[in-house]
Amino acid sequence: MEEIELYPHNQKAYDNLCAMLRDSNRACVVQPTGTGKFVIIAKMAQDNPGKDFLLLGTNDYMYIDQMANLSDIAPGFTPKNLQFMTYATAMAKARCGDEIPRCDVIVADEFHHCGAPEWGKGVQYVVENNPDAKIVGFSATPIRYSDTWRMRCLSETLQAAWSLRKHGLTVYFPCRSTS
């Protein structure tokens, strides 16, 4: 089995995460998309073979894809102590009162979904059934604005523009450069 070697930016995040978990039962890692957050999760599982991890994620495809990528990074390493469950499955188990796997560490990938009204109930159920588990969240963008909020802003902007045009004024919309 090959040892997972982290890139320097992930090693720093991993070291900080381990330090946080020594002092607290909850921690999070926020890094941009594509920078290797799943590799940090796998490293935690590899470095803690006596602990059971439950990874909550948005869909099976992402997990399967990440496991395939992991086989390129650490050939021969398949984390046997890492189970995967979608947020939707956790929600369904909460509704039915079904059994939740016991774990030492709950990992919430894309943890900004934990606050969603229905998926959040599933997360809470997992936590309640593993009261001593440490909880670790991973996300690229932990703050999300609801579609309602974005639509309201767009609607208000367009209404203001139409009102100004109605009175013969020219409307310019500010644009932010993405470069």
Where are these regions (language model features)?
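Structural motif
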Residues: C28, L54-L56, F84-T86, V105-V107
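Short, conserved loop/helix-junction motifs that constitute active-site signature segments
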Residues: N48, C96-V105, Q124-D132
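Walker B catalytic acidic pair
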Residues: D109-F111
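Post-DEXD/H (motif II) to motif III coupling segment of the RecA-like Helicase ATP-binding lobe
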Residues: H113-F173
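Loop/turn-to-beta-strand initiation segments
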Residues: D52-F53, P79-L82, C103-V105, P131-V136
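Conserved Walker A/P-loop ATP-binding site and its immediately adjacent core
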Residues: T33-G34, F38-S71
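Inter-Walker segment of RecA-like/P-loop motor cores
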Residues: T58-R102
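Conserved pre-motif I regulatory segment
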Residues: M1-C28
